Design a protein with these regions (language model features):
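Conserved phosphate-coupling serine/threonine residues in phosphotransfer and NTP-handling enzymes
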Residues: 109-111
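Conserved hydrophobic beta-strand within the GNAT/NAT acetyltransferase core sheet
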Residues: 105-107, 164
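Catalytic-core regions built around general acid/base machinery
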Residues: 90-102
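N-terminal helical cap/lid subdomain that shapes the substrate entry/recognition surface
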Residues: 2-93, 114
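Asp-based, Mg2+/Mn2+-dependent phosphohydrolase catalytic module
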Residues: 1-5, 39, 96-99, 113, ...
Length: 215
């Protein structure tokens, strides 16, 4: 077993914070304004990149229409949605424990960089992380795979001693594509089918340190 403490890379939505209320409220308002009827359960849009669900919601729309829909959503999220959010129970304690042990901690999210930074600042979590990676494009063009690859490369992390911790299949697939292990955050928004594809499953934030140590 390596004596190097693993670097731990956390997803944001559904892993560190419960962002569903703010996301779904803004989605509901924007879809009403666009007269998009019966979109189905909105919670399925928590986690995937905005650009992915604009295609689903506007299957016959133009790229310009999808960009405008994304902009309208983000305008609502910028005004009010980002604050309609909370830190999951046990996450602060988990981060404090991992930091005390000495694990380097990072955030990698498909959310736009400035939103991620604002949310972490709101909850006074920024100081716990070495770096925060989100998308910087207005209409995001980077996949979670690419964002994670950039983080690993720019911080000279070794895939053998790095974990991705997230709640959705996008986190698991990004970890697999970058040849790092993934710990599923079982308290988040993912399904049992998604969690089954991870290397390990943490039922609560309190389980993370022990699972990483035992790996």
């Amino acid at each position: 077993m390596s004596s190097v403490l693993p670097a731990l890379i956390f997803d944001l939505d559904g892993t560190l914070t419960d962002s569903e209320p703010g996301i779904t409220d803004c989605l509901r308002k924007v879809l009403d304004a666009w007269r998009i009827n019966d979109p189905g359960p909105l919670d399925r849009f928590v986690g995937p990149p905005v650009e992915e669900w604009t295609v689903e919601l506007l299957p016959d729309g133009s790229q310009d229409d999808r960009i405008r829909l994304a902009r309208d959503y983000r305008a609502c999220y910028d005004r009010e949605g980002w604050k309609n959010n909370s830190v999951f129970a046990g996450v602060r304690e988990m981060l404090a424990e991992l930091g005390k042990i000495g694990h380097p901690l990072y955030v990698c999210t498909s959310k736009q960089q400035h939103f991620a930074a604002r949310i972490l600042d709101l909850f006074q979590l920024t100081c716990l992380f070495t770096a925060i990676y989100g998308d910087k494009a207005e209409y995001a063009s980077h996949s979670k795979v690419d964002l994670l690859a950039n983080l690993v490369r720019e911080n000279s992390l070794s895939p053998e001693t790095t974990w991705m911790i997230g709640d959705r299949i996008y986190d698991i697939q990004a970890a697999q594509a970058n040849q790092i292990r993934c710990l599923a955050a079982g308290w988040g928004y993912g399904s049992a089918g998604e969690f089954a594809q991870a290397d390990a499953l943490a039922g609560t934030p309190a389980d993370v340190a022990a699972l990483v140590r035992a790996a």
